[in-house]
A protein has these predicted regions:
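Low-complexity, intrinsically disordered short peptide segments enriched in small/polar/basic residues
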Residues: 14, 30, 42-45, 72, ...
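Death-fold interaction domains
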Residues: 127-171
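Alpha-helical structural motif
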Residues: 50, 71-75, 95, 109, ...
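Substrate/cofactor-recognition hotspot
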Residues: 116-120
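Contiguous ligand/interfacial binding patches
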Residues: 122-125
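DNA replication initiation modules
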Residues: 1-83, 151-157
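Catalytic cores of large soluble enzymes that bind and process phosphate-bearing ligands
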Residues: 67, 105, 142
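N-terminal nucleic-acid engagement/recognition segments and initiation subdomains in replication
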Residues: 73, 86-115, 155-195
Length: 195
């Protein structure tokens, strides 16, 4: 994971991070990274310090996803089945594309990218602020990678995991309903004809 950060940042940005950590007041928070959380307020994602805090923040995010934003839950699930080749040693190109795809899908998915990154055996919770800053620097691109890219990668690199998720998606149930109605209309055309 440290290789990700070394490749990820330009030298000037690395110097900024180093200077921030050397300041007498410790790391300076560049801004608060939040999502709409529980009634007690929003969690500052950039201040997560350990696996338990990350898990709590992720669960809070998942519990607050509205039914209208079902695609956010689906993309979280597809992201979880991406294999280690997307977040492990030497995976920078794939790892950064996952970040771009999540950002292009929704700015709310920062917590998903951090949880995904934390799957790396070398993940350091002290880099979460840096990941938040990196996320903030991603520009959304209309023609860029999106949630559809993550679904494609999951299908290519973990077909059984992706299929298990697909069978629990709203899209799957809509397709099943449409196919059943269409099959019924073909089998019984007189019942569907208007007269």
């Amino acid at each position: 994971y440290p290789d990700h950060l070394n490749l990820l940042y330009k030298q000037s940005f690395l110097e900024k991070i180093e200077n921030r950590s050397k300041s007498p007041h410790g790391k300076q928070k560049s801004r608060k990274f939040t999502f709409d959380g529980s009634s007690s307020g929003s969690s500052d994602i950039s201040q997560i310090k350990n696996a338990d805090e990350l898990d709590n923040c992720l669960q809070q995010f998942l519990e607050t996803i509205s039914s209208a934003d079902y695609v956010l839950r689906e993309i979280y699930e597809y992201t979880t089945v991406l294999p280690e080749s997307y977040y492990g040693q030497g995976s920078y190109a794939k790892w950064i594309r996952v970040g771009w795809a999540l950002k292009n899908t929704s700015n709310k998915l920062l917590i998903v990218w951090i949880a995904f990154s934390a799957k790396a055996s070398t993940f350091d919770y002290n880099t979460i602020q840096d990941l938040c800053d990196q996320w903030d620097s991603f520009s959304r691109k209309e023609a860029g990678v999106t949630n559809r890219s993550i679904i494609y990668w999951a299908k290519q690199d973990n077909p059984s995991g992706a299929e298990g998720i697909r069978k629990n998606t709203i899209s799957y149930y809509l397709d099943m309903t449409i196919n059943a109605v269409t099959a019924n209309a073909i089998a019984n055309p007189s019942k569907t004809a208007k007269g």
